[in-house]
Amino acid sequence: MRKSQVYSLVGALVLALASLAIVPPRANAQGPGLVSSIINRMERNRRDLRSLRAGIQMEKYNAQVGDKDMYFGDVIYLPTAGREASVRVDWQKPQRETLSVSNGKYTLFRPRLNMAYVGATNSSRSKVSGVLGFGLNVSQAQLRANFEPLQLLGEGVLYGNVHVTWLKLVPKGKASYKYAEIWVDDNGMPVQTKVVERNDDSTTVRLVNVQRNAPVASDEFQLKLPGDVKKVNG
């Protein structure tokens, strides 16, 4: 497997748009007032969020060939100081893999190959926590400083039972992606995030069965690899 493929997966972490019913914003809900209230709810969620466990679904879309890959698994998340966060994803389908990001480093373990890719979460690889961090670990001040005024795209119901508001985030200045979209529930939790790259490829991540502030120990992010695992530095 080429390193670029590894970095692509490490940089992925985002999921599917299936079963999303969105309607335009109600006339009496339009304008900066509603967007401001959503940002305030997101800020409260960020402040109060000490940990997270959830199911995770990811869709990676290749715009050049019109193809997409789907991934399913479980995620744990532990915010830390600044924008860094500890993230672990245990993929179950289509193949079993574990990705852990903590203390500025990542490990991607592929049991079927008996191989682990390790490296620093800089450059494109920092997206691992960054995609989730669009809403989970970014402050109100950072949202206002780093993005154009947030655009309200609509409201709707995700998977039949989660009411969400749909926002578009366009970065100020130069960025590695064109824009991001987030779907925020009524408690200010971003339950779905989509990042569209400059070549129109996209990665969408969705959290399901979210458990806010569930017990998560810091040592859960330290992978205990078998002694015979081959490590490849990224």
Residue ranges and their predicted role:
Residues P32-V35, Y117-G119, L150-G234:
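Gly/Pro-enriched, hydrophobic low-complexity segments
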